Design a protein with these regions (language model features):
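Conserved SAM-binding loop and adjacent beta-strand
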Residues: 56-74
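Glycine/charged-rich beta-loop-alpha catalytic/anionic-binding loops adjacent to active sites
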Residues: 46-55
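Conserved SAM/SAH cofactor-binding pocket of Class I
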Residues: 70-137
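Domain-scale activation on soluble regions of proteins
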Residues: 8-9, 45, 88, 112
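Short acidic/His/Gly/Ser-rich catalytic and metal-binding motifs that mark active-site loops
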Residues: 40-44, 96-98
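N-terminal auxiliary segments of SAM/dcSAM-dependent transferases
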Residues: 1-41
Length: 138
């Protein structure tokens, strides 16, 4: 999958954002394409704020809850090993990727946002794992 295409999707919402492939804090075996660490935390111009509200690029951030669950799977591999896993609201795909790395038989990452699904595909490729993506869990 294309990191260039994902970068373009990020710039649609955050024109000054850029993706960096970095190891996840606390689970360095996983690398994710995330928004640059030095991205401004200051106020955004009104047009950018409107774009963020309309189509947030939440998939460009690795949420603490995702890191915590990925780390939990690493230390409790038996929860996913040999099983089928469905990751709902997958975002960046960290939990789906952790399930793959901990020997899940099949991992499906579900997110309603097509940009998040692209991020999951890109991040799975970065980590050399296979994740099925879908926008519908039914």
């Amino acid at each position: 999958m294309s990191l260039v295409k994902l970068q373009s999707r990020l710039e649609h919402t955050l024109p000054n954002g850029r993706l960096e492939v970095l190891p996840v804090p606390g689970y360095r075996a996983i690398k994710l394409a995330l928004i640059n660490a030095d991205f401004s935390a200051g106020p955004l111009p009104q047009a950018v704020m409107n774009a963020v509200i309309e189509k947030p690029a939440y998939w460009a951030f690795c949420w603490g809850s995702g890191i915590a669950l990925a780390r939990y799977l690493r230390t409790h591999k038996e929860i996913v090993s040999g099983l089928r896993v469905l990751d709902l609201g997958s975002g960046s795909g960290i939990v789906a990727i952790a399930a793959c790395l901990n020997e899940a038989r099949l991992v499906v990452a579900c997110d309603t946002d097509p940009d998040a699904r692209l991020a999951i595909e890109v991040n799975a490729a970065i980590n050399s794992v296979s994740v099925v993506t879908t926008g519908n869990a039914s």
